[in-house]
């Protein structure tokens, strides 16, 4: 079974966050900026999907915090 998820997350600086996340993109995940942060994950197992989304959301939260301190 193929599991697919797409998340769109609002951000003050989506381009900067995506640049920070991009090196972590495996072949089955992608992340890009389109006036927001867009994340797509396509995997075989629901547990892998949930884990990947959790990782992205935690990293986005961290990036937003760093941008707030620097900004």
Swiss-Prot record:
This is Uncharacterized protein AF_0698. It comes from Archaeoglobus fulgidus (strain ATCC 49558 / DSM 4304 / JCM 9628 / NBRC 100126 / VC-16).
């Amino acid at each position: 079974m193929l599991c697919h998820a797409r998340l769109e997350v609002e951000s003050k600086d989506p381009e900067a966050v995506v640049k920070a996340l991009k090196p972590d993109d495996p072949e089955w995940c992608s992340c890009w900026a389109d006036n927001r942060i867009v994340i797509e994950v396509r995997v075989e197992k629901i547990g892998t999907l949930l884990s990947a989304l959790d990782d992205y959301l935690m990293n986005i939260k961290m990036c937003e915090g760093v941008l707030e301190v620097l900004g």
